[in-house]
């Protein structure tokens, strides 16, 4: 789609370091969105996602992305630079054709794949941020990469090596008790990722490459979820104290001001916290903080939020 469709609305979102181009729909029931949702349904019924991807897949989330690495020692996190805008349409169309005909031939033709890619794009390269089809198509684009990359990691002989991808975030972890070898391992992994990504017209954002050693620190953050080491050596997943503090204060503000949007945000935030920590997240609050909750007639913060 090289000419802007009348159902597409372009917005620009400013972040700390850049301005992102966002393609949204004129309305939730416009023709283009309905077509995109039909395409998503057709593809989802025929596509088997990579076992390594934890993003944009049913019953997988940032929780599963972090949990996969829970008991490893050394972590390397890498980021694909400008991932969605650099996806190659020709390669995507070929991969779409291969994946949709994998279980049963004749599901879709090459021309139909080309048409889908064009209909789900707004330029000659890349997938637009904001289209409902972009996440699924990006996983099709990266499925081959995921398998090949993991195979190359296995050949390095790293103990218990684990690889996951959440959209453009790559996480590699393994066990090791040799600090001297860490930099060599990291250099090799970055070199492999760089060379392999280039085949797909992609590159690493080297500035965002990070590594952590749990034998030195007691926590590491993986796609927004903290893996923390307990005093007894066990590990657990947490969202971090700042998120739980935000939940507490925003929930209390909703008791007096029951603004529907604020209440919805608080309930969504609590759902996120519970999805990661499951139970016991309120143990971080001081007796004074919990006394405030009790003063409203509730035993727990969860009870207070559920009542909003």
Where are these regions (language model features)?
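Short beta-strand-to-loop capping motifs
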Residues: 172-177
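Short beta-strand
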Residues: 161-166
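Active-site-adjacent structural elements in folded domains
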Residues: 156-158
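Right-hand nucleic-acid polymerase module
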Residues: 1-131, 136, 140-154, 179-308
């Amino acid at each position: 789609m090289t000419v802007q469709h009348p159902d597409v609305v372009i917005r620009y979102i400013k972040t700390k370091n850049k301005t992102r181009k966002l393609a949204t729909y004129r309305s939730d029931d416009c023709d283009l969105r309905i077509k995109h949702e039909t395409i998503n349904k057709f593809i989802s019924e025929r596509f088997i996602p990579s076992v390594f991807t934890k993003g944009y897949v049913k019953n997988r989330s940032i929780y599963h992305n972090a949990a996969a690495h829970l008991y490893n020692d050394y972590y390397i996190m890498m980021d694909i630079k400008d991932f969605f805008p650099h996806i190659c349409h020709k390669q995507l169309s070929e991969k779409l054709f291969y994946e949709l005909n994998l279980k049963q031939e004749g599901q879709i033709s090459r021309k139909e794949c080309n048409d889908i890619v064009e209909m789900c794009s707004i330029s000659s390269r890349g997938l637009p941020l904001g289209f409902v089809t972009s996440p699924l198509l990006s996983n099709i684009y990266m499925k081959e990469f995921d398998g090949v990359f993991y195979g190359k990691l296995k050949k390095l002989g790293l103990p218990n090596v684990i690889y996951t991808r959440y959209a453009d975030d790559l996480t590699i972890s393994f066990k090791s008790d040799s600090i001297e070898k860490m930099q060599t391992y990291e250099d090799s992994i970055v070199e492999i990722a760089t060379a392999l990504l280039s085949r797909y017209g992609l590159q690493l954002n080297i500035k965002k490459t990070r590594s952590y050693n749990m034998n030195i620190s007691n926590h590491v953050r993986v796609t927004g979820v903290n893996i923390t080491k307990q005093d007894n050596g066990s590990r657990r997943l947490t969202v971090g104290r700042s998120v739980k503090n935000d939940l507490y204060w925003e929930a209390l503000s909703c008791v007096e001001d029951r603004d529907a949007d604020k209440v919805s945000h608080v309930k969504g935030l609590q759902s996120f916290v519970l999805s990661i920590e499951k139970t016991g997240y309120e143990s971080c609050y001081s007796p004074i903080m919990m006394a405030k909750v009790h003063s409203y007639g509730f035993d727990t913060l969860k009870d207070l939020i559920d009542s909003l």
